[in-house]
Design a protein with these regions (language model features):
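Non-catalytic helical/linker scaffolds that mediate oligomerization, partner binding
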Residues: 1-290
């Protein structure tokens, strides 16, 4: 019987080892390398290491159109605490990547950082520094996603780092790529033009704009991934089940196309040997949707 369920696993510090990679040979369909946490200079070495132990296909997942924090040391921030944001990477201050985003930020912008609900408001901007104030306490850590609450800011659909990574990956015969923060059918077409016809592409749905444009996006590609984590930064958590069901309903009109579901499927198993009843129900319901 042909296997209908496919599993993508992200390789991180705890799974990028010989034992897990050998296990992946018969249990996992695609091994994901997240370029948000890998430098292009490291990529070739990681690919070669993976291939020593497994024949499972590797997928290079781009950073895409996302803002991220750059800090040298994590720290807890209290409500009403003042904070400075630097135009460029700085040991003393928070900076934001891609660095050109500094130019687009305005007074009264609200930045939602990471998944621990840290909120900061921009109070003033002068030369190479922004003065901000914490309006909801939380932990400030490096390389965490930043969502601008009050308005949309245009960002290039892939970064210069992504372009370097794609060249290195293609040189190493990688055939699977994912576009993070796909927002429109134009993003799909641009990504396809960069990669060519010989590569498999997964387009990640993780913004309100992508949900709105999904009817058009799905017509131009074959593989999609609903990232419920980043999507929950753009819509409320209580809307996630409804949105997931809506996207799966649209997919029913395109039977040969695939949708993967990501985030919190088996979160409790970081600490426990078995999933919770809620997680089991979530996975079953997702599969039942198609």
């Amino acid at each position: 019987m042909k296997k209908k369920i496919q599993i993508i696993t992200t390789l991180g510090p705890s799974s990028l080892n010989a034992a897990f990679l050998k296990f992946s040979n018969n249990n996992i369909d695609l091994l994901r390398l997240n370029m948000s946490h890998i430098e292009p200079e490291e990529l070739e070495e990681k690919i070669k290491f993976i291939r020593k132990f497994t024949k499972t296909n590797i997928c290079v997942d781009t950073e895409g159109a996302q803002i991220r924090t750059k800090v040298f040391k994590p720290r807890d921030l209290k409500k009403y605490q003042n904070l400075k944001i630097s135009r460029v990477k700085d040991k003393k201050f928070l900076s934001l990547y891609p660095y050109e985003i500094f130019e687009k930020l305005k007074t009264k912008d609200i930045l939602n950082i990471g998944f621990n609900n840290l909120l900061i408001e921009i109070k003033s901007k002068k030369n190479n520094l922004i003065n901000a104030k914490v309006i909801r306490a939380g932990k400030l850590e490096n390389n965490k996603g930043v969502h601008i609450e009050n308005r949309k800011i245009g960002i290039n659909f892939i970064t210069e780092k992504d372009k370097k990574a794609i060249l290195i990956a293609k040189k190493n015969n990688i055939k699977h790529f994912a576009l993070s923060f796909t927002n429109s059918s134009k993003d799909v077409e641009k990504f396809k033009a960069i990669l060519g016809d010989s590569c498999q592409k997964i387009f990640k749905i993780e913004t309100k704009r992508a949900v709105k444009n999904f009817n058009k996006i799905i017509k131009n590609a074959d593989n999609f991934l609903i990232d419920r984590g980043d999507l929950s930064k753009d819509i409320t958590v209580v809307q996630i089940p409804k949105i997931q069901r809506k996207l799966m309903e649209i997919k029913k009109n395109f039977l040969k196309k695939k949708i993967f579901i990501a985030t919190n499927l088996l979160e409790s198993m970081i600490e426990n040997n078995y999933p919770t009843r809620g997680e089991a129900n979530d996975i079953y319901s997702s599969l039942e949707m198609g």
